[in-house]
Amino acid sequence: MSQSNNVTDLARANIRALTPYMSARRLGGNGDVWLNANEYPLGTEYQLTTQTFNRYPECQPKHVIERYAAYAGLPPEQVLVSRGADEGIELLIRAFCEPGQDAILFCPPTYGMYAVSAETFGVERRTVPAQADWQLDLPAIANNLEQVKVIYVCSPNNPTGNLINPADLQAVLALAQGRAIVAIDEAYIEFCPQASVSNWLKDYPNLVILRTLSKAFALAGLRCGFTLANSDIIQLLLKVIAPYPLSTPVADIAAQALSPQGIEQMRQRVSEVRANRAWLQSALQDCACVEQVFTSESNYLLVRFTASSSVFKVLWDQGIILRDQNKQPGLANCLRITIGTRQECERVIAALAPLAGIDNSNNIDNQSKTHSQTSSIRKGTI
């Protein structure tokens, strides 16, 4: 074996070539209005009720599991708690995918961690682009299932904000039966709880649901997520999860957030976010620099601008940090705006109002131009 003085040469080739997921915090910025990470804009207050920091925590804290199971309407044996839903994404790959042999499948534009997690473990990333209306391309999925072990579907989808048709989700589950796990990412489901498919678990043994406390529960800094599945899958995931995934303070606060009082507070936050979302969606229509505001079932809006790079910089310079989505398929000139407080939403509109519109139709890629939701260059909502 050849020797090298560069220790990075010792790393796996796929890791050396890996482009890491660029989280909102990695991208940085010096703003005071953070609307780029789909966080709740205000802090929450909790008091620790236990001080047993000298002892290792339980792998699966009973009080957290039982409270989330009650909240989700499931038996405790169908719930696993982890360091955010991102760890749940990774656990599925570790448990079900053979590196260098199996693949995962997802449908861009969607959440970026599916791809990064697969690449980290040496598992093929297979993409089937969403259709023009951002729904699933079922025939294409059916034609790309060879060696696929996990299919990830985000609903509501990040960054587009739309729900995936339930009939299409059932079709994917049927296509994958006996072949692959179907993981439905419900990170934003609290903003549209009627759309949850958790009651399908009894009918589909290959269904997994990913959840989090980062969004509506306003605990992004806690790093606490949940995987819902049949007990056989949960037992497999317990084989590969870290021995102490949740620290004692995290488990303590998570249990408080899942108390009846905590759940009621979460629902009040959801109501507030919905009201601010409706206000911002309406106000954006009057901005000359806005081409399209896409209807969302989540805590963010996807907006197509006439010149998104200019808009992004103008707001950045005013301390308002948004999320650029230009590199996602079909999202040319699109920025994602997290729903902040009413005051923060008003600052966004105040910054956008002076900006003139630009005829940028020639710069929108062909996929965007044929997108049924944006087939005409005009303002509106969908």
Swiss-Prot record:
This is Histidinol-phosphate aminotransferase. One of its GO terms (biological process) is L-histidine biosynthetic process. Its EC number is 2.6.1.9. Homodimer. GO terms for molecular function: histidinol-phosphate transaminase activity; pyridoxal phosphate binding. PANTHER family: HISTIDINOL-PHOSPHATE AMINOTRANSFERASE, HISTIDINOL-PHOSPHATE AMINOTRANSFERASE-RELATED. Keywords: Amino-acid biosynthesis, Aminotransferase, Histidine biosynthesis, Pyridoxal phosphate, Transferase. Pathway: Amino-acid biosynthesis; L-histidine biosynthesis; L-histidine from 5-phospho-alpha-D-ribose 1-diphosphate: step 7/9. It catalyses: L-histidinol phosphate + 2-oxoglutarate = 3-(imidazol-4-yl)-2-oxopropyl phosphate + L-glutamate. HAMAP family: HisC_aminotrans_2. It comes from the Bacteria. It is an enzyme of class 2 (transferase). Its cofactor is pyridoxal 5'-phosphate. InterPro entries: Aminotrans_II_pyridoxalP_BS, Aminotransferase_I/II_large, HisP_aminotrans, PyrdxlP-dep_Trfase, PyrdxlP-dep_Trfase_major, PyrdxlP-dep_Trfase_small. The modification N6-(pyridoxal phosphate)lysine is found at K215. NCBIfam families: hisC. Belongs to the class-II pyridoxal-phosphate-dependent aminotransferase family. Histidinol-phosphate aminotransferase subfamily. Residues 363-382 are annotated as: Disordered. It comes from Yersinia pseudotuberculosis serotype O:1b (strain IP 31758).
